[in-house]
């Protein structure tokens, strides 16, 4: 079973405008409300690709109920901790000539609720996969990723971490199965600008020496690189298409990677290219990637 963790799920209010004029009344040409959060995105894309998962996290108030209802309307399984106070955040995504985001803060997460999450993590078994994705809200301890990984150590659970450079560096000692920095984050981890494929792979190798098993490097319009624990490396150009929506593309890449890995019986090559295709399919669409969109892009990789 695949599990995802989203500490601070949201309702994403998505607005498209011809132009955003500050201080004026702006009228939208498109609007939608979707469940948001990196782990939820991974679960929804997995569902679109035909794979089940169970989403863990915290929700609160009427907005939390809406997050759960919307998420389950996609056929996904939620196993959230429901908080007694506060409300889940609303994030506003404005898409005009430039993308602008206004993200809410989210509810206070008390220690008792944190313990309840850890109780749910007890259900994970040998061979399961756990996706830890996104930032840590300021209402949680800043070492929560490390605590979760330490709690699950030695149980045969594949853990994927998709987070900022600081969080990634902290969890390497726990041997994450997969990490997914982009090329800029990878350079920032080592305090330098990495310009070539050789430099990127060399520093991905350094992350492996620090504990990571497999390193997936996204490079936006330049494609992606992948270094496996066996020392194999793969490269893919970015599929051709028009960028419509950057939100969720990285999460979709993780979901596609997992789907490809599961479907192929553990082929790194299939996992990598399906990850690239799925991330791009979401970027080229108003919504998250679907199976037909992914298959169409795969044929050209």
Q: Which residues are covered by each model-predicted region?
A:
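Positively charged, low-complexity intrinsically disordered leader regions
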Residues: 1-23, 32
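Hydrophobic anchor at the start of a short beta-strand
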Residues: 2, 52-53, 78-79, 159, ...
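Substrate-binding N-lobe of the ribokinase-like
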Residues: 27-87, 301
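Conserved phosphate-binding/catalytic loop of the ribokinase/pfkB sugar-kinase fold
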Residues: 83, 93-126
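Short beta-strand scaffold segments in enzyme catalytic cores
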Residues: 90-94, 224-227
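Short beta-strands and strand-loop turn motifs
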Residues: 101-103, 128-134, 162, 180-185
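Conserved phosphate/ATP/ADP-binding segment of small-molecule kinases
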Residues: 142, 146-230
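Conserved phosphate-binding/catalytic region of the ribokinase-like
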Residues: 151, 197-301
